[in-house]
Amino acid sequence: MDHNLQVTLVEPKRSYFTCPFSNLVLGGLKQMGELTHSYENLQRRYGINVVHVAADHIEGTSKIVVLKDGKKLHYDRVIVAPGVDMRFDLIENYGPDDVESMPHAWKGSASTLRLHRQLESMPDGGTVLICPPALPYRCPPGPYERASLVAHYLSQHKPRSKILILDAKEQFPKQALFSAGWERLYGHMIEWFNGSAGGLILRVDAKGMAVETEFGSEEGDVINLIPAQWAGRIARDSGLTDETGWCPVDQRTF
């Protein structure tokens, strides 16, 4: 590392939970603690200044990051990693409070732990609903990797259970590979329904643990509803997104 550079990381959380590999927790192959890391090495080994305060917005013309506590950080170069925010406005009867009973487990450790505990407490012979959104969203193959690892857990601990994937899409990434693997490893445990076959979620009943599609209502003992997403708020507030709500990317250079 060039010691002439002064690097500051603005991050409100005291520890970092890796969303990559979080499906291994749901599959019973890793513990939450194995995916949780502190920022101490960045400070101690590399001299990076870690500020545990959320960034509020970026003033691009003056090259300033304004923090939630009002402090301002001047920069020569800023790298923005806004993450994603959930869209709770696209499904009827669905809001932020419903993630308690229908966890998305798509960001943060608390939601992943909640889904993990629901899988542990569901009865053998129960039904898991996994409801992926339409593209684009973070990690397009993720819901299908998740279905695979949940099936791994269920096949060992609750083998009479089933997984229904109610998908807003007509097809999904790496579909042929996933479908072949599901059939070979788990038989008929996993069923996938595309949007035109009843996979598109129109509204939810969080108290009744049910989702409604144009073909009727589907109940689940566990419902992993993954909502539509867009770029994190700081990107939207700082003018970094386009009309889609996402940050445009030059695919030639990324």
PLM region spans:
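A general structural motif
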Residues: 4, 125-126, 160, 220
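Beta1-alpha1 glycine-rich phosphate/pyrophosphate-binding loop at the start
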Residues: 1-49, 134-176
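A Rossmann-like FAD-binding core segment of flavoenzymes
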Residues: 45-58, 62-65, 73, 151-251
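A conserved beta-strand/loop capping segment in the N-terminal third of enzymes
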Residues: 42-93, 126
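FAD-site-proximal beta/loop scaffold in flavoenzymes
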Residues: 89, 93-122, 219-254
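Glycine-rich dinucleotide-binding loop and its adjacent helix/turn
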Residues: 82-157
